From Swiss-Prot:
GO terms for molecular function: protein kinase inhibitor activity. Keywords: Cell cycle, Protein kinase inhibitor. GO terms for biological process: regulation of DNA endoreduplication. Probable cyclin-dependent protein kinase (CDK) inhibitor that functions as a repressor of mitosis in the endoreduplication cell cycle. May inhibit CDKA-1/CYCD complexes during S-phase, preventing the re-initiation of DNA replication. It comes from the Eukaryota. It comes from Arabidopsis thaliana. Interacts with CDKA-1 and D-type cyclins. This is Cyclin-dependent protein kinase inhibitor SMR6. The gene is SMR6. The keyword Cell cycle applies.
Length: 112
């Protein structure tokens, strides 16, 4: 197993649209700027709008009726409140216990 005689850092050229090769990975220089067309001058846009209004066909417009507008001020509902905890013990309540009748023992039989 030997090392190759070629250096892996070959091709480190200037970044003027040229390609860099570092450690076997190619890295391209920065991207070129994208050129786009300019918008039409305002004079042309107004002519198109005038043609739209002059024709018999209606152009699409944004609805301006009161029903379609978003209300300016919406009232939020109040924040939810915690429920009161159920009372576990009532000290004022008088408890009435069952008082057995005096002849209850006659119901049960004694076994010998």
């Amino acid at each position: 197993m030997g090392f190759s005689k070629k250096s892996q850092f070959e091709g480190g050229l200037e970044s003027d649209g040229k390609k860099w090769v570092i450690a076997g990975i190619s890295i391209r220089a920065s991207l070129k700027p994208v050129k786009t067309k300019l918008r039409a001058p305002p004079e042309i846009v107004t002519e198109v709008e005038e043609d739209c209004y002059n024709e018999e066909e209606e152009c699409s417009t944004t609805p301006t009726a009161k029903e379609t507008k978003i209300p300016e001020l919406l009232e939020c509902p109040p924040a939810p409140r915690k429920r009161r905890p159920a009372l576990k013990c009532r000290s004022n309540v008088v408890r009435e216990f069952f008082t057995p009748p005096s002849d209850l023992e006659t119901v049960f039989l004694r076994r010998r």
